[in-house]
């Protein structure tokens, strides 16, 4: 399979936030047949849609563009494994997270499956995704 462009959003609101982003970038780049092709700047953002008790925990966000020979489902599984390896726990909906890795786009394909919807259904509503896309001159 020829390499495809995968756009991934990284976010962390548990310290050390910058370290979690760096480790996620390293782990993504270490996936088989995958390399980083571009990165946005890192930006601090307010949380969106979180419970009030977590509203003070600002995020560091970054968009990563990768080239990968992996299939979309394998890529997605590996992303979730990276989240788990970096201590992501999903006990509270929209709660604090060491790392959040979202697949925004994968080679322009459209999927609507229970565990994977592409392109990301809320990407265009989120400034922390749209601003870095504009910074890198990428359109969804």
Kindly give the residue locations of the regions a language model identified:
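Short, structured patches in soluble enzyme cores that scaffold and shape functional sites
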Residues: 10-12, 68, 134
């Amino acid at each position: 399979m020829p390499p495809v462009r995968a756009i991934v959003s990284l976010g962390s609101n548990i310290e050390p936030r910058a370290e979690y982003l760096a480790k996620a970038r390293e782990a993504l780049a270490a996936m088989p047949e995958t390399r980083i092709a571009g990165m946005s700047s890192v930006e601090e953002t307010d949380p969106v849609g979180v419970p009030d008790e977590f509203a003070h925990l600002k995020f560091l966000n970054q968009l990563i563009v990768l080239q990968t020979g992996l299939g979309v489902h394998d890529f997605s599984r590996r992303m979730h494994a990276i989240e788990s390896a970096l201590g992501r726990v999903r006990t509270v909906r929209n709660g604090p997270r060491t790392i959040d890795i979202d697949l925004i786009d994968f080679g322009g394909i459209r999927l609507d499956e229970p565990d994977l919807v592409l392109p990301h259904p809320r990407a265009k509503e989120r400034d922390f995704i749209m601003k870095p896309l504009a910074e890198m001159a990428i359109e969804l």
